[in-house]
């Protein structure tokens, strides 16, 4: 049966495809097999060469043959026999040569493998570099010093100089007394030295400052240090911020409004500027710097201040806080950013959901650390710090020198008070920190305490607001949300002020609106809870009113710290009732420290004389 043309073409294509697959498919050959194939190729080449030589010889013989004479058969037979014998010996020689060459190549390869293993496991001795001695500073001549012909003066006039004689005056040369000259110059130097010491430090250049000037400078600004190898503080912005630029861990305890944000933002930007730019290759490793704060309002405020500095450098800052869409925040993080400002709870959520990582974050700021501990954020803060890379921590010993090119973790911790819990957190995560104390937290604040009853508080509040006027602003602090709504409702009925509210029960948009309008002085009274007691900077706040006394003195310090910021004065008024006796002792001590007036009722009360938890009469029965 004849095969059709299509069938024939199909069979041919399948065969061609199969042959091509067999040719392209890699086949594993053993070492012995490869050696056998190489030997066979050499033998084939030799046989082919011999075959071509025989054909060439036969052709030449046929050309030279006369054809008329009979061929000498015997002589031709002997010649062919000799040729076969020579060819056999040549073949054997070539085979031995090929075999020896293959064995030599195998031996060289084996020696290379052995040398590589020796170099890997035993190591090699590196050749020592020849030490070149430095040339001597004093050049030595080949001759003796006594042979120098220029050592003595050859001119007779200069060999015997004429001694000058006194001409006039008091027996001095040219009437000039050298001793009097030296005395006058010494007196001039002493006067200049005294004038230099009496000059104020602000009139001197940075390199002219001595230890006395630095001591006076620190006393003028109430700056104190605890630590070693601490650089001098900066006098103005042109001299930068020394501690941050040296990558030292810092614990800052200072008054509110003293520029703490700039103190960690500027060194942070200087640190980021030394790192590679944020691109698609490294933005998946997370931000370069992290700032943790206790409240959403403080996070947004720090974000605004950071953007003011970072926008000129092209750095991006993102805030991560609660009460906002975590998906939108995750989208911002996925686009890459150098700085993240976050509250501990929301940041931990993003870490658990893999929205952000901290693989390359080596700059950490804990702002209002005592407030975060009071709000029970210490476990979340510890979990976040444990996620950060620990391979670049500074050495625990202070004497060890840091490598210049290596990047170490830098940690800033700011607080208005130094509590034991803050010290415990610092000992765990900070290495050889410098404790910097700047100013007094209540230096520019006038504190007033009014003993009253709960029913009389609102009437006293109305009187304070009436005395405030329309051009000044005040913040009223209470302890509960319900009381915020109660006070605002009654103040709106009276209609004597423009009042707004802010507490944790409101949405983030409402809180931002109230705070922004209060800063613009559209409202002059803000009633709030402790959500506004930390970190926020409100300019020209005239008065703080504690409608309810807080439960701790730490909260009291931060509440009244909203006024009297950045060197300006302010007034803090507190309504105190007998139900607040747990803080009587601490409040009395605070007022005495600030030289403020202590109400007689508070001074005479038994609870103000002893620290809470102590029993003064426990030894009275002995």
Curated annotation (Swiss-Prot):
Where does the record place the region Disordered? 50-97
Catalytic activity annotation: ATP + H2O = ADP + phosphate + H(+)
Mark out the compositionally biased spans (Basic and acidic residues). 66-97
GO cellular component terms, alphabetically, are:
catalytic step 2 spliceosome
Keyword set for this entry?
ATP-binding, Helicase, Hydrolase, Nucleotide-binding, RNA-binding
> According to the UniProt entry, what is the EC number of this protein?
3.6.4.13
- Its top-level enzyme class, in one word, is hydrolase
Q: Where is this motif: DEAD box?
A: 367-370
The cross-references to Pfam families, in alphabetical order and at most eight, read: DDX23, DEAD, Helicase_C
UniProt domain Helicase C-terminal: residue ranges: 460-606
An MF annotation (GO) of this entry: mRNA binding
Q: Where is the Helicase ATP-binding domain?
A: 241-436
Checking Gene3D superfamilies in the record gives: P-loop containing nucleotide triphosphate hydrolases
Keyword Hydrolase attached: yes
The UniProt similarity line reads: Belongs to the DEAD box helicase family. DDX23/PRP28 subfamily.
Protein's name according to its UniProt entry: Putative DEAD-box ATP-dependent RNA helicase 44
């Amino acid at each position: 049966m004849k095969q059709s043309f299509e069938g024939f073409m199909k069979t041919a294509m399948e065969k061609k495809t199969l042959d091509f697959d067999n040719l392209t498919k890699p086949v594993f050959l053993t070492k012995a097999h490869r050696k056998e194939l190489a030997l066979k190729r050499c033998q084939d080449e030799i046989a082919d060469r011999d075959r071509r030589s025989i054909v060439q010889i036969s052709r030449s013989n046929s050309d030279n043959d006369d054809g008329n004479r009979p061929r000498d058969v015997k002589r031709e037979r002997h010649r062919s026999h000799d040729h076969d014998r020579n060819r056999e010996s040549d073949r054997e020689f070539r085979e031995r040569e090929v075999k020896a060459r293959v064995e030599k190549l195998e031996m060289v390869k084996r020696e290379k493998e052995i040398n590589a293993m020796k170099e890997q496991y035993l190591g090699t001795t590196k050749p020592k570099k020849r030490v070149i001695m430095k040339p001597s500073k004093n050049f030595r001549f080949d001759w003796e010093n006594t042979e120098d012909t220029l050592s003595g003066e050859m001119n007779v006039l200069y060999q015997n100089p004429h001694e000058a004689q006194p001409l006039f005056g008091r027996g001095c040369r040219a009437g000039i007394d050298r001793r009097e000259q030296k005395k006058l110059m010494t007196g001039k130097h002493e006067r200049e030295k005294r004038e230099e010491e009496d000059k104020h430090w602000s009139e001197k250049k940075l390199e002219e400052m001595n230890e006395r000037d630095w001591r006076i400078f620190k006393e003028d600004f109430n700056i104190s240090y605890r630590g070693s190898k601490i650089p001098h503080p900066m006098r103005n912005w042109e001299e930068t911020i020394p501690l941050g630029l040296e990558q030292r861990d810092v614990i800052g305890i200072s008054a509110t409004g003293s520029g703490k944000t700039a103190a960690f933002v500027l060194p942070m930007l200087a640190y980021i500027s030394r790192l590679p730019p944020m691109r698609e290759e490294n933005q998946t490793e997370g931000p370069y710097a992290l700032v943790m704060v206790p409240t959403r309002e403080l996070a947004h405020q720090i974000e605004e201040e950071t953007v003011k500095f970072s926008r000129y450098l092209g750095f991006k800052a993102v805030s991560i806080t609660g009460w906002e869409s975590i998906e939108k925040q995750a989208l911002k993080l996925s686009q890459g950013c150098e700085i993240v400002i976050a509250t501990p709870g929301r940041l931990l959520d993003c870490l658990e959901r893999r929205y952000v990582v901290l693989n390359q974050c080596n700059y950490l700021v804990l702002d209002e650390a005592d407030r975060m501990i009071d709000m029970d954020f210490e476990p979340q803060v510890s979990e976040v710090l444990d996620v950060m890379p620990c391979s670049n921590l500074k050495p625990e010993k202070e004497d060890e020198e840091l490598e210049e090119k290596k990047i170490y973790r830098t940690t800033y911790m700011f607080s208005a008070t130094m509590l034991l819990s803050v010290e415990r957190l610092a000992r765990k995560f900070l290495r050889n920190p410098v404790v910097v104390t700047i100013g007094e937290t209540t230096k520019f604040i006038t504190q007033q305490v009014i003993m009253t009853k709960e029913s009389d508080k609102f009437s006293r509040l109305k009187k304070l607001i009436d005395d405030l006027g329309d051009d000044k602003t005040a913040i009223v602090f209470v302890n509960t949300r319900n009381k915020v709504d109660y006070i605002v409702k009654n103040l709106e009925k009276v209609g004597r002020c423009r009042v707004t509210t802010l507490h944790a029960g409101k949405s983030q948009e409402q809180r931002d609106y109230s705070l922004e309008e209060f800063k613009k002085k559209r409202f002059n009274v803000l009633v709030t809870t402790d959500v506004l007691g930390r970190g926020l900077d409100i300019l020209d706040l005239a008065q703080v009113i504690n409608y309810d006394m807080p439960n701790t003195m730490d909260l009291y310090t931060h509440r009244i710290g909203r006024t009297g910021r950045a060197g300006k004065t302010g007034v803090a008024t507190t309504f105190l009732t007998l139900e607040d006796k747990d803080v009587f002792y601490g409040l009395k001590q605070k007022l005495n420290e600030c030289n403020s007036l202590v109400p007689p009722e508070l001074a005479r009360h038994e609870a103000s004389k002893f620290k809470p938890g102590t029993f003064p009469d426990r030894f009275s029965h002995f």
